[in-house]
């Protein structure tokens, strides 16, 4: 069924980008599949130029690979990718927390605590989307204060690659419960003024692939691409 042409205050390229990302998030464009530019252009009612520009952005972010004269492939998220992303996010968030530490006052800490309480409520109500949103907002408090927009952009893009590609439909409750404990421990370190310890905890526990591996395997167990590119 043909989709109505996109009408929005955003540029056509931005609209097409948002559409493609939403298709990936919902699992309509699965890892390993291909994108037909001709068909997609007709479906959206746009020319190939904004579509090409959107695909170039997606390629820079690691979501697709453009093969000249061969087509566009939606990238597979392999176990090695996940390991690499955890290393990168851990290092960057650790740096961000150190840079922002002196700006984390009572209002910011209360905001972070509020997100933790929201995560607990989300687990009780089996609302994964709410849990995910509160989790992101917790980290966004110190990311937003670190003063490095490039760092923040990279972290957010990698999180989308990890958890929005496509969005999993259920909890790994043991992981979410453990994660809440980690957020509470991080808040405790921040409250005690232990900047170095808090930064190390982010890097070496919260974003440690080795620490989180058993949960990661459960989270991606329904993703064939994960197992086909399994532990190396």
Q: Model-derived features: where do they sit?
A:
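Mobile beta-alpha loop/short-helix "lid" or hinge segments that flank ligand
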Residues: 60, 64-65, 158-160, 175-176
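Short helix-capping and inter-helix turn/linker motifs at the boundaries of alpha-helical repeat units
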Residues: 11, 109-110, 174-177
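Conserved amphipathic alpha-helical segments that form helical-bundle/coiled-coil interaction surfaces
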Residues: 103-168, 181-185, 197-208
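Positions in alpha-helical segments
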Residues: 72, 80, 98, 117, ...
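C-terminal regulatory/effector modules of DNA-binding transcriptional regulators
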Residues: 175-232
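Amphipathic, non-transmembrane alpha-helical scaffold segments
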Residues: 13, 86-89, 131-135, 176, ...
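Short linear motifs at protein or domain termini
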Residues: 1-98, 102, 214-232
């Amino acid at each position: 069924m043909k989709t109505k042409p996109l009408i929005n205050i955003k540029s056509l390229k931005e609209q097409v980008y948002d559409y493609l990302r939403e298709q990936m998030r919902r699992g309509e464009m699965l890892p390993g599949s291909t994108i037909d530019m001709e068909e997609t252009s007709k479906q959206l009612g746009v020319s190939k130029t904004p579509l090409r520009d959107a695909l170039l952005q997606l390629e820079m972010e690691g979501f697709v690979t453009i093969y000249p004269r061969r087509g566009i492939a939606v990238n597979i998220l392999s176990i090695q990718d996940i390991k690499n992303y955890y290393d990168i996010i851990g290092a960057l968030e650790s740096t961000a927390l150190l840079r922002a530490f002196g700006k984390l006052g009572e209002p910011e800490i209360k905001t972070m605590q509020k997100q933790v309480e929201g995560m607990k409520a989300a687990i009780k109500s089996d609302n994964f989307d709410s849990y995910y949103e509160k989790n992101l907002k917790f980290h966004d408090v110190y990311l937003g204060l670190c003063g490095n927009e490039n760092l923040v952009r990279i972290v957010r893009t990698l999180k989308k690659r990890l958890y929005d590609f496509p969005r999993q439909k259920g909890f790994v409750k043991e992981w979410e419960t453990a994660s809440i404990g980690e957020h509470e421990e991080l808040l405790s370190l921040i409250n005690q003024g232990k900047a170095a310890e808090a930064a190390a905890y982010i890097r070496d526990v919260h974003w440690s692939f080795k620490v989180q591996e058993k949960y990661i395997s459960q989270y991606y167990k329904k993703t064939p691409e994960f197992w086909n590119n399994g532990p190396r």
